[in-house]
């Protein structure tokens, strides 16, 4: 099961939303993780946003979060491009049940589910889902609905 993700190989352009997120992570002086999550999930309360901040007591702990987007290959020159190409070679042979559950309002990964569905044999015949009125973090935007999707998928594979 994949949700709101991509496995870039550097040979196709990434979305404007992804590139904006990448630039923001690199350039924004006040990199407040809780506030970032709160902007995309306005229903999160102060305590929930604070919980997302908890692993980052100061900026030195945020290096991984800042660097993470730069690991996604934007050209085939990236080391991770070759790793992802190899992963796709395996996924293109994967014939076990494979489900996509994406949201309708994620500016970074919108439409990415179609590639997974087209390329992975195990996607055939699955109850792929687009969760409506949800953004990138499905567990926050539509936690119960997403859990129901996962539970039904697991039950269908027994």
Q: PLM features: what roles do these ranges have?
A:
Residues 1-132, 139, 153-157:
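Flexible "cap/lid" subdomain of the alpha/beta-hydrolase fold that forms the substrate-access gate
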Residues 134-147:
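Catalytic histidine-centered segment of alpha/beta-hydrolase-like enzymes
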């Amino acid at each position: 099961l994949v949700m709101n993700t991509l496995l870039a190989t550097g040979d196709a352009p990434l979305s404007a939303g992804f590139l904006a997120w990448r630039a923001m992570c690199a350039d924004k002086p006040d990199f407040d993780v809780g506030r970032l999550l709160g902007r995309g999930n306005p229903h999160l309360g102060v305590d929930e946003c604070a919980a997302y901040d908890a692993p980052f007591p100061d900026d030195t702990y945020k290096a991984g979060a800042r660097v993470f987007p730069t690991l996604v290959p934007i050209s085939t020159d990236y080391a991770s491009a070759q790793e992802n190409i190899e992963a796709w070679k395996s996924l293109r042979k994967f014939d076990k049940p494979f489900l996509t559950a994406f949201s309708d309002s994620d500016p970074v990964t919108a439409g990415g589910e179609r590639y997974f569905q087209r390329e992975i044999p195990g996607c055939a015949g699955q109850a792929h889902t687009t969760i409506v009125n949800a953004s990138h973090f499905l567990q926050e935007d539509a936690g119960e609905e997403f859990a129901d999707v996962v539970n039904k998928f697991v039950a269908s594979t027994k």
